[in-house]
Amino acid sequence: MIAKCPFNYTGSKHGILDQLLPLFPPMEGRVLCDLFAGGGSVGVNAEAEVVLFNDLNRAQLGLLEYMYHTPSSLFLEAVQRCIAEYGLSESSRYGYAHYGADSTRGLAESNKSAYLRLRDDFNLSKQEAGTMDYVKLYTLLIFGFNNQLRFNTGGAFNTPVGKRDFNRAMQHKLVTFMQRLKSKDARFAAQDFRACLRDLSASEEYAGRLFVYCDPPYLITTATYNERGGWGEQDELDLLAALDELDAAGVYFGLSNVTHESDKANPILLEWIKSRPYKVCRIKKSYRNSNYHKQTSTHRTREVYITNYHL
């Protein structure tokens, strides 16, 4: 059974893991590098025992690492104490009626003032101490809109209040995910992908057993991570060149990407595919529930998985 990430993040592969994971090479004895790990869904659910989670989003990566090193029961208790401290709703104990709400309208009205106080306290401590309180951060994710992890350009967490709370389903999702994460020999790195790959190539520990999975920002999408110029053509070219170097060194890789999005195409990726002997698999995915894709009758996204090994 797939362990779903207990918070939402742009570009999650949770919805296609049933297609993606069977395309991975045999994982016994391999080290998986999840080069753009995001919320960790791929690394957590892959069969590899040793997983390197790498991502430049330090809040996201730091939360994963904190969950890995903290006993599940202690983390759960700390979150529940935080909820009680700020007076946030506990529908799993008291039900919706206790808060004058129902499951349709949700709990946003009841939680808004307490949520904003928690958000202000988190941002203030982050600014003053230069560190993150991951219990407060995860509590914000629970009560935030769509459980989204979002920061503004000034580094402040700015997700608005949502309509749900730490219900039984959310608690189960958290515990299941943490148990699966803890079953791995997990390592964490917050490096630019170029630096990460250089370090991996120089490591004797990983020699001969490395598999690199890449789910980079997609050059032609309008996802949040590209709205501020977070991924450009040079990044795309550098990543594809790095994958060629992995192939030349006999290292297996897998790349998730998008060749077409609405009326746009990715000529850099298409030319690379055309001029290389790599295998290309079409991935079927619906974006109907995504918060960052336009919903029009002409919308089309062509997602692919590209590998340098025989499937």
Segments predicted by a language model, with ranges:
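Long, positively charged, glycine-interspersed low-complexity recognition regions
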Residues: 219, 228-311
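Short amphipathic alpha-helix with an adjacent loop that forms part of the alpha/beta core around
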Residues: 197-207
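S-adenosyl-L-methionine
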Residues: 1-36, 41-42, 46
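Conserved SAM/SAH-binding loop
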Residues: 190-196
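Mobile active-site "lid"/loop adjacent to the S-adenosyl-L-methionine
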Residues: 153-165, 218-238
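Class I S-adenosyl-L-methionine-dependent methyltransferase module
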Residues: 49-184
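Conserved proline-anchored active-site loop of SAM-dependent methyltransferases
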Residues: 20, 32-46, 53-58, 138-145, ...
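A structural motif corresponding to the C-terminal end of an alpha-helix
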Residues: 173-187, 241-254
